[in-house]
A protein has these predicted regions:
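Short, well-ordered alpha-helical segments enriched in acidic and aromatic residues
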Residues: 51-69, 76
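Short, low-complexity N-terminal intrinsically disordered segments enriched in polar/charged residues
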Residues: 22-59, 171-182, 190-195, 199-203
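Surface-exposed, charged secondary-structure patches
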Residues: 26-27, 37, 70, 79-132
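Bacterial N-terminal signal peptides that target proteins for export
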Residues: 1-10
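Bacterial N-terminal signal peptides
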Residues: 9-19
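A mature extracytoplasmic/lumenal domain signature
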Residues: 61, 71, 121-124, 140, ...
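Short beta-strand edge/turn micro-motifs at domain boundaries
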Residues: 27, 137-168
Length: 203
């Protein structure tokens, strides 16, 4: 009797779980249209970066938006954001010829009324003017606000692992090369001094 009761209870739990899952699957996403707009913004930002088109990027941002760049520098407002980008990417005294990325969304955006938050990862490639190109993985997070019926970026944060990245690996490699070079130079110097001392003794 107890075994039969247990089976009935298990069956009821399974049926209830199936019913809840079915209802959840049939419930329409209240933010479906918002998600489409946010993905369009995401695409425009990514394409703007890869085309070196700061105007295309800024068009997705509120006029008072803040961007925290990979070097931890902050830009506030369209003019400041454009000035930073042109100082870093381009020609003349710029640091980079170009900057490209392949971005991914980590999870669906979270909504709090007319505010949406999302985050993800980026596979970046930098082409400096004065050195070889290098790649680095980074992370991004964004806060968007629905203003006058349209979604705009109000805060964009870019970050990278400062303790483990390709630039640090390169520095470590250079340290090893320098150490090996110093050791070799020391051995050569000791060999030369040894020969000189032996020559003096022979005299």
């Amino acid at each position: 009797m107890r075994q039969q009761t247990y089976r009935v209870m298990v069956l009821l739990v399974v049926l209830m779980g199936w019913s809840v899952a079915t209802i959840a699957a049939d419930t329409p996403d209240a933010h479906a249209e918002d998600r489409k707009q946010l993905l369009q913004i995401f695409s425009e930002i990514e394409n703007g970066i890869n085309e070196q088109n700061i105007e295309r990027m800024v068009a997705q941002m509120d006029e008072n938006a803040t961007v925290i760049w990979l070097n931890a520098e902050a830009s506030r407002g369209h003019a400041d954001i454009k000035a930073y980008y042109k100082r870093m990417v381009g020609t003349g005294d710029a640091i980079l010829k170009k900057y490209m990325t392949k971005a991914k969304v980590a999870a669906p955006a979270r909504f709090m009324g007319d505010i949406a938050v999302a985050d993800g990862t980026m596979e970046d490639e930098f082409v400096p003017i004065k050195r070889d190109a290098f790649k680095m993985n980074s992370n991004w997070s964004v806060t968007c606000a629905k203003l006058n019926g349209k979604w705009k970026i109000v805060h964009l944060h870019l970050s990278a692992n400062v303790f483990n990245n390709s630039l640090l690996d390169e520095v470590k490699q250079m340290v090893w090369y320098a150490a090996a070079g110093g050791l070799l130079a020391g051995l050569v110097l000791m060999f030369g001094i040894g020969r000189l001392m032996r020559g003096k003794r022979a005299d």
